[in-house]
Regions:
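PLP-dependent class I/II
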Residues: 2-197
Length: 197
């Protein structure tokens, strides 16, 4: 089972702790491994999110993945995973076959950022900017869209999931927005089962 329980893309939803526990319990009972993608964790704006599902994992059933790319530096293509040793070893082998591993320089830059506190300082600055941008976006939505749409104020990351009250051609809306230099992603992009309206 693959999940983004913290600031899920595209909805921005955070899975509450009781649901995390219930999901882990169910997957343990059914022998279903969990891949927890937690790349947005450090982009909380209002309050830190619940601990990762991996922190509750006493059976080695969760593979936890994260990265510096989403929260800090998109160009710093470095990620990591935590999981059972056999899984980690196998995935490391696959990674080596694909691209011979991550640059040593990239790893040294990441180590320096994390060791010196520069990462946390930078993320605090990013959180501050994201909070301003989120608040600005919500003000614009309230001012211009409140009669046409509904949304939730995200508590982290950079996603605002907007639900239109009336049926609209998502493709047409996408193209009109693009002409105004505004990028929106229709919900159907994220779900094969939904139509483009």
């Amino acid at each position: 089972l693959y999940t983004i329980p913290t600031f899920q893309n595209p909805t921005g939803i955070v899975m509450p702790m009781p649901r995390r526990k219930k999901l882990l319990q169910y997957c343990n009972e059914m022998h279903i491994p969990i891949i927890e993608d937690d790349v947005f964790r450090d982009l909380w704006l209002d309050a830190p999110p619940p601990p990762p599902i991996k922190s509750l994992d006493g059976h080695g059933n969760v593979v936890y993945i994260s990265s510096l790319s989403k929260c800090f530096a998109p160009g710093l293509r470095l990620g990591w995973l935590v999981g059972p040793e056999a899984v980690v070893q196998r995935l490391a082998d696959v990674k080596m076959q694909m691209d011979y591993g991550v640059s040593v320089l990239t790893q040294q830059v990441a180590e320096e950022l994390l060791r010196t506190g520069l990462y946390e300082k930078g993320v605090q600055n990013i959180r501050s900017q994201l909070t301003e941008r989120r608040d600005f976006m919500i003000r614009l939505l309230e001012r211009y869209f409140s009669e046409f749409a509904e949304w939730s104020v995200p508590s982290g990351s950079f996603f605002v999931w907007v639900r239109l009250k009336n049926r609209v051609s998502a493709e047409k809306l996408f193209n009109l927005a693009l002409k105004e230099k505004l990028l929106i992603m229709p919900g159907g992009v994220y779900d094969r089962g939904h139509s483009s309206s």
